[in-house]
Design a protein with these regions (language model features):
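A conserved alpha-helical element in kinase catalytic cores
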Residues: 39-83, 91-109
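Helix-rich C-terminal or lid/interface subdomains of diverse kinases
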Residues: 199, 203, 207-244
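Catalytic-loop of the protein kinase fold
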Residues: 164-166, 171
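Protein kinase catalytic-loop region centered on the HRD/HxD motif
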Residues: 157-163
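A glycine-centered beta->alpha junction motif in the catalytic cores
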Residues: 81-95, 131-139, 222-236
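A cross-family kinase active-site recognition segment
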Residues: 92-144, 162
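Active-site Asp-x-Gly
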Residues: 163-164, 176-217
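ATP-binding glycine-rich phosphate-binding loop
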Residues: 9-31
Length: 244
């Protein structure tokens, strides 16, 4: 159906401007019901979109700042691979204090998603100790030595409790104001050990002690290497994962 599906949000619904940052999706600012919003068109399955939409609604009810699905005229969360979400104001984190606020927000996300089901088709880092594939990850495409290093990093997370992790808390996906921290772009969100989020933060923002920080940083670097393999960023992240 493509962008023609935008008409399901009303006769006046229209695309405004293409937005940067969408790798797996076509992302635009849109106007729906006279309000600015964001439209995202991609190839995700209905089950995947339902998981994400349900999560975002739950986070909104829990008081976390994140995009919220805008329903079609007939009450659907998405249609034809298109999801429309509220526009989130704010800028990226710049200071160490900003990043500490991000860490607090991620911990709030982890607290309110206990028992959340796994995103359809995804696997956690500890699942990949034995599995070879899971949505964005294909360990068979990596050199065997790289797989050994990644699995050694993830093995240190074995037995930990799992929650929903954002999966990609980089500055482009964070919108700060003086009042709150919002997380956008939930494409990489799934159920995993919270260390994957916390280990990705700069400046020691998560406040972990030395050993815990090392475990989190190694696991996060291994995850990003595997998810992005094999672009230059993935190679860079793999270089941060210690050899076994």
């Amino acid at each position: 159906m493509g962008w023609e599906a935008l008409g399901l949000w009303g006769e006046d619904a229209a695309r405004i401007e293409k937005l940067a940052g969408g790798v797996a999706n076509d992302v635009w600012s849109v106007r729906v019901g006279g309000k600015l919003a964001v439209g995202r068109l991609g190839q995700r399955s209905d089950a995947d979109l339902a998981w994400e939409a349900g999560l975002l609604q739950h986070l909104d009810r829990q008081g976390l700042a994140a995009p919220v699905p805008v329903l079609t005229i007939d009450g659907r969360l998405f249609a034809g691979g298109l999801m429309v979400m509220t526009f989130v104001e704010g800028g990226p984190p710049k200071t160490e204090e900003d990043w500490r606020r991000v860490a607090d927000t991620l911990r709030q996300l982890h607290r309110v998603t206990e028992g959340w089901p796994q995103r359809p088709g995804w696997r956690s880092s500890t699942d990949l100790l034995t599995a070879d594939t899971g949505t964005r990850i294909d360990l068979t495409a990596m050199p065997p030595e790289a797989v050994v290093r990644c699995r050694a990093a993830w093995a240190r997370l074995a037995g930990r409790e799992t929650r929903v992790v954002h999966g990609d808390p980089n500055p482009r996906n964070i919108r700060l104001t003086a009042e709150r921290v919002a997380l956008i772009d939930w494409d990489e969100a799934h159920v995993d050990v919270p260390d994957l989020d916390l280990g990705a933060l700069p400046h020691g923002a998560a406040g972990l002690e030395a050993t815990a920080r090392d475990i989190a940083a190694q696991a996060s670097a291994a995850w990003e290497a595997a998810v992005c393999w094999k672009d230059d960023y993935a190679v860079k992240r793999l270089a941060e994962v210690r050899a076994v």
